[in-house]
């Protein structure tokens, strides 16, 4: 009889065992749904990671897009265009033989600063002729030494 009274009091207060069971069922269902959603997310994430790690495709068009620009500037104002070409990852050959020595030096200083900032390289090919190469291009100096030693081209006047 005491249990009947206790059940009635709990029913009035709202603490029936049936309510607890329903509440526990709801909590368990929510946890199961949450686990399913997180499992799907983790599974998709793992699938993406495994496909990226197995992907060894190299874009072959990157090497063919290298362009060479040959410039013979008439004044210092063309320095920005030369450096823009370098910034756009183009190889630039600059001939400053027709410029005044002071203007050529200013232009060379500007190009040297730009190539340094862009991790490029500035090489003197001949007196007054310079090669600016972007960071994605490697320049070999062996050819110049070989040609000079064989006297085919006298690069070192």
UniProtKB/Swiss-Prot annotation:
Subcellular location: Cytoplasm
Gene Ontology biological process terms, A to Z: division septum assembly; FtsZ-dependent cytokinesis
Name of the protein in question: Cell division protein SepF
Domain of life: Bacteria
Disulfide bonds: none
Keywords: Cell cycle, Cell division, Cytoplasm, Septation
Originating organism: Clostridium acetobutylicum (strain ATCC 824 / DSM 792 / JCM 1419 / IAM 19013 / LMG 5710 / NBRC 13948 / NRRL B-527 / VKM B-1787 / 2291 / W)
Residues spanning the membrane: none
The family this protein is said to belong to: Belongs to the SepF family.
UniProt subunit comment: Homodimer. Interacts with FtsZ.
Lineage of origin: Bacteria, Bacillati, Bacillota, Clostridia, Eubacteriales
Entry-linked HAMAP family: SepF (MF_01197)
Pfam families listed in its UniProt record: SepF
InterPro entries recorded: Cell_div_SepF, Cell_div_SepF/SepF-rel, SepF-like_sf
Functional summary from the UniProt entry: Cell division protein that is part of the divisome complex and is recruited early to the Z-ring. Probably stimulates Z-ring formation, perhaps through the cross-linking of FtsZ protofilaments. Its function overlaps with FtsA.
GO CC list: cytoplasm
């Amino acid at each position: 009889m005491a249990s009947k009274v206790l059940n009635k009091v709990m029913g009035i207060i709202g603490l029936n065992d049936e309510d607890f069971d329903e509440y526990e069922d709801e909590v368990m269902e929510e946890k199961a749904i949450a686990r399913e959603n997180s499992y799907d997310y983790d599974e998709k994430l793992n699938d993406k990671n495994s496909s990226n790690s197995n992907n060894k495709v190299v874009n072959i068009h990157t090497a063919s897009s290298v362009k060479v620009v040959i410039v013979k500037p008439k004044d210092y104002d063309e320095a920005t265009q030369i450096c823009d070409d370098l910034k756009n990852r183009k190889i630039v050959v600059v001939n400053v033989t027709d410029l005044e020595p002071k203007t050529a030096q200013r232009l060379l200083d500007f190009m040297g600063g730009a190539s340094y900032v862009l991790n490029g390289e500035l090489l003197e090919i001949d007196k007054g002729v310079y090669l600016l190469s972007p960071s994605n291009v490697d320049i070999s100096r062996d050819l110049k030494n070989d040609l000079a030693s064989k006297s085919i081209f006298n690069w070192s006047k």
